[in-house]
Amino acid sequence: MASPKDFISPVNSGQKLVYPFRNYLNYLHDKYSDLQTGKIADYIPELALAAPQWFGISVITTDGQIFEVGDCQQTFTVQSISKAFVFGLALEDHGREYVNSKVGVEPTGEAFNSIILDEKTNRPYNPMVNAGAIATTDLITGQNATERLKRILEMFKRYTGRDHEINVPVFLSEKSTGNRNRAMAYLMLNFGMVSDKIEETLDLYCQQCAILVHAHDLALMAATLANGGVNPITGIRAIDEHYVQDVISVMLTCGMYDASGEWAYRVGLPAKSGVGGGITAVVPHQLGIGTFSPLLDEKGNSIRGVKICQNISEDFGLHLFNVAKPERDLKTWLEGNS
């Protein structure tokens, strides 16, 4: 099997140069396709129907180049990845100060579904855990539940350039097993962190988690954030540029469940994962990464997805705090692909 070193230089193929980034992604896909460790999420019954061999990698640059390999059009439910983008919509609806009065931005070190609030402020710790995400969803404005859901779906369309559907069986499955989320919501209601529209907000939260996406969508959503909030394919603004830093800051510190510290240390990119098997990762000003594989580690993160992002970050020196000159120049690898 080839290694990244085999792709260091462009190859002269007839009259044009074929650059290696597409081959590099093929190499990574081949390398990790046989990785069968991990477990498909089954605490939501419908999620257990995913096939373990599904595996896709998509990379989209801020100038609109697309590089993909594997099952990049296989749909799955977005799950917790929705939290980052709904957080951005709440910021647009209410502004930074008000949103931060309801939801903090501190990592917890606890499981994503922990029933725990900040003892001093009674806020959920951050928008990426379930309690914080429920509080964030509660902030989405609209005259009724239908309008609020429509606004979330329209927001997704701005990021991806296409209409999205909800997987109704997954929504109903999550709703029927959602007593823990209901307990969180009522605890927050007791402290005035959410409105009294508990059942409406919980339904909306379960619906946003059941939105169908694929790896291409996740790469484009990340590329949109990397591009200052403007979709690099459609040119449509998906989020006010002033709130992009809020979203990706919390993704960096809290986006990978209780493995977020390890992720920030080893990968160093703003990212969000979901138990459906997706990961979206942002390389500011450069590109977005979207991966899909439903085999999860004990933290709830896609094992193959984590490996892919770690490889790309290390091989091209993309860690946000990297100060060493990378061995490979990303721009050279990206240009000239066909």
From Swiss-Prot:
Molecular-function GO term, any one: glutaminase activity
Catalytic reactions of this protein: L-glutamine + H2O = L-glutamate + NH4(+)
InterPro entries associated with the record: Beta-lactam/transpept-like, Glutaminase
Enzyme class: hydrolase
Keywords, comma-separated and alphabetical: Hydrolase
A Pfam family that the UniProt record links to this protein: Glutaminase
GO biological process, alphabetically ordered: glutamate biosynthetic process; glutamine catabolic process
Keyword Methyltransferase: no
Keyword Glycoprotein: no
Assembly and interaction partners: Homotetramer.
Name assigned to this protein: Glutaminase
Organism this protein belongs to: Microcystis aeruginosa (strain NIES-843 / IAM M-2473)
Chain's gene name: glsA
